[in-house]
Amino acid sequence: MKYTTQMDAARKGIITKEMEIVSKKENMDIEILREKMAKGQIVIPANKNHKSLDPEGIGSGLKTKINVNLGISRDCPNVDAELEKVKIAIDMKAEAIMDLSSFGKTEEFRQKLVNMSTAMIGTVPIYDAVGFYDKELKDITEKEFLDVVRKHGEDGVDFVTIHAGLNRDTVKTFKKNTRVTNIVSRGGSLLYAWMELNNKENPFYEYYDELLEICAAYDMTISLGDALRPGSIADGTDASQIAELMVLGELTKRAWEKNVQVIIEGPGHMKLNEIEANVILEKKLCHGAPFYVLGPLVTDIAPGYDHITSAIGGAIAASHGVDFLCYVTPAEHLRLPTLEDMKEGIIASKIAAHAGDLAKGVQGADEWDLKMSKARQKLDWEEMFSLSIDDEKARRYRKESSPEHEDSCTMCGKMCSMRNMNRIMEGKDINILRSED
């Protein structure tokens, strides 16, 4: 039996090779996986033209996944540096990479990225439109916007962020409700500008059915972008954000009618106590579609440390049911991330994702922690290093500050609780003052 997309296959009772791979990775019964995909609760972004892809699932009951942003900008157009970031992201087991290139002809970089990446690839096609056509934003036509999306599909992109929820109605809500930081979504701000300059409806909303046909043709997952996400604590969970979310819920149903897989994008900046409510709202208004959040950042005061503000919010969000975290680096709000910034961002996001998985009871999530605890109890340093989320850093710290005795560290020395409890439990003496046992 033939199928067009992963969702179409799931609804027809067909088990695809991508489903088989995800089922084994997640230790989820394949029929449960298929049923959730048929309902839109799980997606497997897998463009038919992405031949090097090692597929991953995103959604209900699965491990929380992370995405790494990279790409070329006008001020930092170094392609080789960005390709090095791709290699690091893959080595560090990020499940997704988004090419957010915003300068020049990005096609060659995007094609290299797809060809070399086992991780799923996402893009924001509107970023590419100005460079692709070599036109000012206001001069790009509705058809040209759609053609850029088609080009990304041809190139093998697995999921595309489309800010289709920013329409004339949500713009009215935005204009009525004063914000501190207006529209902070780059794609959202470009679309808003295009709409205002041309006095027209958002082309991705007006021609949404045509957009869905493009996505279905390549089995591109549509990541419905939140153009009106809050960019400051003051704007969190405001009328504009929720108005757009309601539209995204309607667009989700329309995509599912065409068997197009959907991810919903979310905040952004918000207070800790608002995170759970935002997850509940998304799951309710968007009918259980997987939720993909940028952070959320839980305070605005920490430039240089936003990988921490994001990890705090990300862990809480994941614990309440968020399915996909976009990493944030220490460079957020300051500059294009360096390789080191990127590494720190990936690790912070992976910690947040795993902490969330522990809290929401993802199958097998606690096995990693149990192995680490047992290694600590045995003072098996090599095992601890091998289990560390960043084994290189753990080894380096141990090497830089070596203890007198191997069965301790320089924090506690011979007062190490693990060391002394092991000895007492084995019926041995505890020696703290003497230099030798």
Curated annotation (Swiss-Prot):
**Which reaction(s) does its UniProt entry say it catalyses?**
5-amino-1-(5-phospho-beta-D-ribosyl)imidazole + S-adenosyl-L-methionine = 4-amino-2-methyl-5-(phosphooxymethyl)pyrimidine + CO + 5'-deoxyadenosine + formate + L-methionine + 3 H(+)
Q: Which cofactor does it need?
A: [4Fe-4S] cluster
Q: What is its EC number?
A: 4.1.99.17
Q: Quote the record's binding site residues for [4Fe-4S] cluster.
A: C409, C412, C416
Q: Where does substrate bind?
A: N69, M98, Y127, H163, S185, R186, G187, D226, A227, L228, R229, E265, Y292
Decide whether keyword Zinc is in the record. yes
Keyword annotations: 4Fe-4S, Iron, Iron-sulfur, Lyase, Metal-binding, S-adenosyl-L-methionine, Thiamine biosynthesis, Zinc
NCBIfam families per record: PRK13352.1 (NF009895), thiC (TIGR00190)
Known PANTHER family for this protein?
A: PHOSPHOMETHYLPYRIMIDINE SYNTHASE, CHLOROPLASTIC, THIAMINE BIOSYNTHESIS PROTEIN THIC
Question: Pathway, per Swiss-Prot/TrEMBL?
Answer: Cofactor biosynthesis; thiamine diphosphate biosynthesis
What is this protein called in UniProt? Phosphomethylpyrimidine synthase
Gene name on record? thiC
Taxonomy, superkingdom: Bacteria
GO biological process terms, semicolon-separated? thiamine biosynthetic process; thiamine diphosphate biosynthetic process
> Which residues form each disulfide bond in the chain?
none
Report the family membership.
Answer: Belongs to the ThiC family.
Keyword Thylakoid assigned to the entry: answer is no
